């Protein structure tokens, strides 16, 4: 294994932020092309990294400077905006800033405001984004929106003269630096010579690499090793809570009946009704006590009036009449949709063609190659394998891969990595710490596994996903009585390894929560990367990719999102 490859995976970032205890402006690298527009020239901002994350705060600072603005400390004369995390409140912000009150003319605004400004390339209204003191008296003058002078209509994007005259204006954030012989490097381009510039290079051991793979990090001295509590500001975000602290379901007698209906709607293709039931079921499972009245049911977010009526019917009669009227098609549709490669629409088509059993499908239906394989191994695919069998499958792939290159990393993800006792399938992620040697391994590895008789059927022989390559197939361990199992092999570049590891570990519910949280912060999370300053249109559709943030480990992803780190076993939602 190339040790330099490992070192590059844990870069030492150069900080570009102001000392919060100083009135001096931040020292910012040489401006990049694009300042000329200067549409942020009237902005003098301090970015408070708490909750936002240091890397994202640095990115905001860089964007402000690039577009003509200035970055100040919170105490600097003339500061106009102090930008804080979405979950921050006014009083806590002042405590962290060590200020008795906001500086004259300054506004406390949420980071979403700055993200919106960067997306629209103009200073936008701060209405709905600004934080004010709950103790503010009614006769105290209110700051004008987005720093505009209310007496001067038509001056959108220009800060009021009165605000700027309260104190001496800030000096320019940077003075023109001497000409460099080479263009300045961006944060993601810092090389090993930059890392060693302070005389101390990062020391990354094999234990660090093992921690990255397993997701288990050593507990610092003095800590009890239990899961960190979720920050209060993150509320009920699933990704902020350890799954080990799932609430007791006090309404099991209700949710188990609603789940039957939800499943019926799902196999019938009524996805919106199925989604509505799923939300109500999750809300009832999380409720802190048994539901006892119609009013109480209606008060639970996610449970509407009609759902509350069904809850009361179950409470009063112990039954739900709607279950008596589930179509006879539902069990047949469920049977068909469990064939790998057949979704709800295909299952419905087969039902309407008059098929009622797997024998009908086997003898009469027109099947794709994938559906034929799914039907052939129907019972094996539905049977969950013991954890020990999944470990043997991972080992088989690892030994074969490392026969080509001993430095390759192979990690089983999914329910196996989350510590489940049984697994439905196995996802094996493959990479190499040097960032290069994973290339060219995909096809030779699959050929080797086929020659050994380990891979028995190919479902999708190669699926390209950016720089990632994915194989979906069927395997069987050597020996009598072994069953056919679903296996996915994904080869990824090391720069995407942490985000891919997070994505393929799951759970799906946990991943959806993390992606949704990232979206609220103007970011985007995928199996490839975590990006900041993402541009979305009014429908929330991403139209600008933003800037990829460095994420050498899963821990970095959590940190950049302002989340406490959750080990894989704590993500089993």
From Swiss-Prot:
Which parts of the sequence are annotated with region: Disordered? 126-235
> What's a BP term from Gene Ontology annotated to this protein?
double-strand break repair via nonhomologous end joining
Skewed-composition ranges (Polar residues) = 127-149
Entries under Pfam families matching the protein = DNA_pol_B_palm (PF14792), DNA_pol_B_thumb (PF14791), DNA_pol_lambd_f (PF10391), HHH_8 (PF14716)
For this record, the Gene Ontology CC terms, alphabetical, are: nucleoplasm; nucleus; site of double-strand break
Question: What reactions does this protein catalyze?
Answer: DNA(n) + a 2'-deoxyribonucleoside 5'-triphosphate = DNA(n+1) + diphosphate
**Under which EC number(s) is this enzyme classified?**
2.7.7.7, 4.2.99.-
Q: Where does Mn(2+) bind?
A: 425, 427, 488
Keywords, comma-separated and alphabetical: DNA damage, DNA repair, DNA replication, DNA synthesis, DNA-binding, DNA-directed DNA polymerase, Lyase, Manganese, Metal-binding, Nucleotidyltransferase, Nucleus, Transferase
Q: Where is this region: Involved in primer binding?
A: 418-427
- The reply to whether Protease figures as a keyword in the UniProt entry is no
- GO molecular-function annotation terms? 5'-deoxyribose-5-phosphate lyase activity; DNA binding; DNA-directed DNA polymerase activity; metal ion binding
- Annotated dCTP binding sites: 384, 415-418, 424-427, 511
Q: What ranges does the record give for the region DNA-binding, renumbered to this chain?
A: 263-277, 343-346, 464-503
What positions constitute the catalytic site? 310
Ranges where the BRCT domain occurs: 35-131
**Required cofactors, per record?**
Mn(2+)
Principal place of residence: nucleus
Localization, per the record, is: Nucleus
Q: Which domain of life is it from?
A: Eukaryota
Q: State the family named in the UniProt similarity comment for this chain.
A: Belongs to the DNA polymerase type-X family.
Instruction: Please give the subunit comment from the record.
Output: Interacts with PCNA. Interacts with PAXX; promoting POLL recruitment to double-strand breaks (DSBs) and stimulation of the end-filling activity of POLL. Interacts with XRCC4; promoting POLL recruitment to double-strand breaks (DSBs) and stimulation of the end-filling activity of POLL. Interacts with NHEJ1/XLF; promoting POLL recruitment to double-strand breaks (DSBs) and stimulation of the end-filling activity of POLL.
What is the documented function of this protein? DNA polymerase that functions in several pathways of DNA repair. Involved in base excision repair (BER) responsible for repair of lesions that give rise to abasic (AP) sites in DNA. Also contributes to DNA double-strand break repair by non-homologous end joining and homologous recombination. Has both template-dependent and template-independent (terminal transferase) DNA polymerase activities. Also has a 5'-deoxyribose-5-phosphate lyase (dRP lyase) activity.
Q: What is this protein called?
A: DNA polymerase lambda
What is the source species?
Answer: Rattus norvegicus
């Amino acid at each position: 294994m190339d040790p330099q490859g490992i070192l590059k995976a844990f870069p030492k970032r150069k900080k570009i932020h102001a000392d919060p205890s100083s009135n001096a402006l931040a020292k910012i690298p040489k401006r990049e092309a694009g300042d000329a527009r200067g549409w942020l020239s009237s902005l003098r901002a301090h970015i408070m990294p708490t909750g936002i994350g240091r890397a994202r705060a640095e990115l905001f600072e860089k964007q402000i400077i690039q577009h003509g603005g200035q970055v100040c400390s919170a105490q600097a004369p003339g500061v106009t905006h102090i930008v804080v995390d979405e979950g921050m409140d006014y009083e806590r912000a002042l405590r962290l800033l060590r200020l008795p009150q906001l500086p004259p003319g300054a506004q406390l605004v949420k980071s979403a405001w700055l993200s919106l400004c960067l997306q629209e390339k103009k200073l936008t209204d701060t209405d709905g984004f600004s934080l004010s003191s709950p103790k503010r008296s009614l006769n105290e003058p209110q700051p004008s929106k987005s720093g505009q002078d209310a007496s001067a209509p038509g001056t959108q994007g220009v800060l009021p003269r009165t605000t700027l005259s309260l104190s001496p204006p800030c000096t320019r954030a940077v003075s023109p630096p001497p000409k460099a012989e080479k263009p300045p490097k961006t944060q993601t381009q810092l090389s090993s010579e930059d890392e060693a510039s302070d005389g101390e290079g990062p020391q990354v051991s094999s234990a660090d690499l093992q921690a990255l793979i397993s997701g288990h990090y050593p507990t610092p001295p003095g800590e009890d090793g239990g899961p960190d509590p979720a920050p209060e500001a993150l509320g009920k975000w699933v990704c902020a809570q350890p799954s080990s602290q799932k609430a007791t379901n006090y309404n099991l007698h209700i949710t188990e009946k609603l789940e039957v209906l939800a499943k019926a709607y799902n196999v019938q293709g009524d996805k919106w009704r199925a989604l509505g039931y799923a939300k109500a079921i999750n809300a009832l499972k999380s409720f802190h006590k048994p539901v006892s009245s119609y009013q109480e049911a209606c008060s639970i977010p996610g449970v509407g009036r009609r759902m509350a009526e069904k809850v009361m019917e179950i409470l009063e009669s112990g039954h739900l009449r709607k279950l008596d009227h589930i179509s006879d098609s539902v069990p047949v549709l469920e049977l068909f949709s469990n064939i790998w490669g057949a979704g709800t629409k295909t299952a419905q088509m087969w039902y309407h063609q008059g098929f009622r059993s797997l024998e009908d499908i086997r003898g009469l239906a027109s099947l794709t190659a994938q559906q034929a394989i799914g039907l052939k191994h129907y019972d094996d695919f539905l049977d969950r394998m013991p954890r020990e069998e999944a470990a043997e499958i991972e080992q088989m792939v690892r030994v074969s891969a490392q026969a080509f290159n001993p430095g390759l990393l192979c990690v089983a993800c999914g329910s196996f990595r989350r510590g489940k006792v049984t697994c439905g399938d196995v996802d094996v992620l493959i990479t190499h710490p040097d960032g290069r040697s994973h290339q060219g391994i995909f096809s030779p590895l699959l050929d080797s596994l086929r020659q050994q008789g380990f891979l028995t059927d190919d479902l999708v022989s190669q699926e390209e996903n950016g720089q990632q390559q994915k194989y979906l197939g069927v395997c069987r361990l050597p020996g009598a009585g072994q069953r056919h199992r679903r296996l996915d092999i994904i080869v990824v570049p090391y720069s995407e390894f942490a985000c891919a590891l997070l994505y393929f570990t799951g759970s799906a519910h946990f991943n959806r929560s993390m992606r949704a949280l990232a979206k609220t912060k103007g970011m985007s999370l995928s199996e490839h990367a975590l990006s900041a300053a993402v541009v979305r249109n009014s429908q929330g559709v991403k139209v600008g990719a933003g800037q990829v943030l460095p994420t050498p480990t899963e821990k970095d992803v959590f940190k950049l999102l302002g989340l406490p780190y959750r080990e894989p076993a704590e993500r089993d939602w």
